[in-house]
């Protein structure tokens, strides 16, 4: 590697900044990192830098510009067992990338990549090896002739290593990867890029030039694209000359904090301890970003990934001897490390720390219950913990085998690991058979268990009641045979009348009943066509195979149905009033309100909101009947049915049609006629992200209650202001005018008081050489009055004057105000009021700023006021004397 110069980026932040700036100068638009929760429904998390641009590459979305560059936060958990073990595996990482959408291609991509890594990052050509697709002669030629790389440093590889595709069909193309050689002294004979101790791949250039059809044939794309990715953590390891990514400034401060808390020295620790520290250092970064992006710990999907990461950290914390809550302390370090580049972390800091604490405490309680069982086994005098009991600890209490072994060893007893493995294998066999109940494990996921169940038949469109059979019971994340009174359960049925949360609509509420059984259902979620009923057993015993009846709360269903139909009418009205291109970006259909997110480059005006409301209410009054039927998706789209962008639909779809008003693909519940909505009211409209607006609205009973509350408020205002409703506006305008006049009178009185307080100061100004100096405390004046006083005194004393005033406007609030005013002569000599006031206010734990001739500041510590003014007096006397002597 070339020797580092003072301009060579060395910190992780500098590496990121230089990458983005480099490509920005090459006319790339800098795109902020997208959320870890992708718009793409085919993936659970953002796993690559190109994922936010996938719709652009597929031609489904307009390109943000011809060229783009980004630093994208990503999470991958497919190799979680390697995290902390290898030098470079992570769950959370940042991918630096530059992209071309039909603009430049191989030559520019390769030349710029080389310029970046050699000129900007200072890497030596002797440390770089490149790989290319063995049939990509164009890239080989560019590397040889244009870049000048020695042929032996160009390694040709097959399709497995150097040909990228988005799937079995679609855009694809060869790629060229840059590797860093940590041991160039070994030469370029017989290079093995799989040698992880010697080589690390750090920059991948993908040349998307083909489209692969279902038969595997490649045809040229109309537009050739570039997609590149550079791992920030890997480049930091290279430039900071570290043994692994974990010891870079991106992660190591977290590891240091964990070492401090656990009183363990990282460098002198054994490998097992280092692995635990590195796992914690990695996982905490993933966790804070997941929570900040809106993920909530649960047993499903993204929520399970979050929960799994937190529990792994708690487990490895236990291995480090950390028996008390510690994760929030590490999260605080992680947030401080990354908040400059990800401001949302700072904004969501309290929420992040709170969620981590709650989840850690919850899991520690589970661990404590497991420890009690373990203590009983130890105190029983047994010399060996059986495999069955070890598996029970693991399976029921989430107790890692390693922790069981550690505690057993401390008490001089053994653990039947082979028996444990046998129980684990038996569980896997039961899962494969899918005919017996299995337990959820700490490292397992409810998402996987759903595959054990057949599709739930939903028969709730036409009836709110249904006969059903209990097919699965979950109790505290474990599949069980029975549940009793007072226990919270998750129930799977063979068929149900409960609507499962999907398409933005909340799940139904109600009851599941049998002879002596009552389960109150408070939520239903649909996953992979399996309906999960959440509730509590109010009476009786719930058993597998039990025959039951489902009974949906009809009032709640009616409210949700009304709000769902209202959402369809709202979208149609927005298309009419705002723009035909308005499309749904998200929605919530709840019992008490609806929320609709849609694309719009600017806010909706008050006039447009009024027109939308009026149009929706006119459709309600017209009493349109809804026609709902199933048909082929192609037919529905040909008829003009609206489909949500990015949503996946079956070949047969359900179409909800309000004739001449709205037609959408939708699986939700709806009213029979629009008049059932009663009325419609928009209660808010706001922007939630770039190009996306959000409307919240009410219909039916909720809308009537809203109007009733407003009417009650108007009545109260009429009583207070002694006016009838028609006079309210005039009365408020009159009061506002009176208030303005009174405030003017008050300000005039304040100015007179201020003048009385400061008028005598001009005659008592101190002479310091050629200059007049006033430094004084004036209490009881607000900011405006203090400013007027300083400017007035400066005007009276002339160009060679300095006025510094500090005071306490209101002693009850315990705040300080400062103002500094310089005459023109001092400004010409280079004096700056803004700089001086910063120095003064800092003494009192404050801050401020301003122009060279005038500045103001606020501060908190009123006890330091005299110290601040004395500092100013000494500082200015020295400076003014020096100016007078010249």
Curated annotation (Swiss-Prot):
Gene3D superfamilies: 2.40.30.130, 3.10.310.40, 3.30.54.20, 6.10.250.550, Bira Bifunctional Protein, Domain 2 (3.30.930.10), Threonyl-trna Synthetase, Chain A, domain 2 (3.30.980.10). Its cofactor is Zn(2+). Its EC number is 6.1.1.7. Its main location: cytoplasm. Keywords: Aminoacyl-tRNA synthetase, ATP-binding, Cytoplasm, Ligase, Metal-binding, Nucleotide-binding, Protein biosynthesis, RNA-binding, tRNA-binding, Zinc. NCBIfam families: alaS (TIGR00344). This is Alanine--tRNA ligase. It comes from Prochlorococcus marinus subsp. pastoris (strain CCMP1986 / NIES-2087 / MED4).
